Amino acid sequence: MNKKVIIIGSAWPLRAGGLATFNERLAKQFIQEGFDTSIYTFSLQYPNFLFPGSTQLSNEPAPAHLKIKACINSINPLNWVKVGNELRKLKPDYIVVRFWMPFFGPCLGTILKLVNRNKFTQIICIADNVIPHEKRMGDTLLTKYFFSSIHRFVTMSEKVNQDLKTFTQKPSINIVHPIYDNFGDIISKEEARKHLALPVNEKIILFLSLIHI
């Protein structure tokens, strides 16, 4: 029987972004490696007052060949208990959970505490951030609550790994973020510039960040 992996984090039908794209690609890789894989994502990820956009939902079709269950409500404790008990009884071999901001500490931490009662499932956290970019009162408590249920950690930058060690000495590994291979074939710089109507030989600065006003 194939080992069972459940990924907890953003995925379709939520709007595509870095986390959702990563989780869906990770699920496909687990499937290719022979694991029985599914994703548990959010039925409600952010309350509206925390979400600046017009919609949190994708208008794209569901990813092919992926089992995705949108069932986690980030602000409903009764839902956390329901999902946690469901996963506890399901007894997956591994849960891979994403952590990127303390807001999700109570929700995901409670779910995982219930899962841990089966004394079987290994819980691995991919920590995108440990210390949030915009700090708020209570962040440390929420982060510690979540981390208390994790068995092992994966980080994708040395700085995040260092931040992690200020919270816990549980096993961790730092792995460079993989290059995505699901956005089409790589093209040359010359082709890309022609497509974007940019000068082929000029020096161009590409700015990838946010500007706070």
Task: Give the residues covered by each predicted segment.
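A short helix/loop element that forms part of the nucleotide-sugar donor recognition site in Leloir-type
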Residues: 184-198
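Charged active-site motifs of nucleotide-sugar-dependent glycosyltransferases
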Residues: 4, 94, 198-205
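Conserved small/polar residues in nucleotide/adenosyl-binding loops
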Residues: 211-213
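Donor nucleotide-sugar binding/catalytic pocket of nucleotide-sugar-dependent glycosyltransferases
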Residues: 148-186
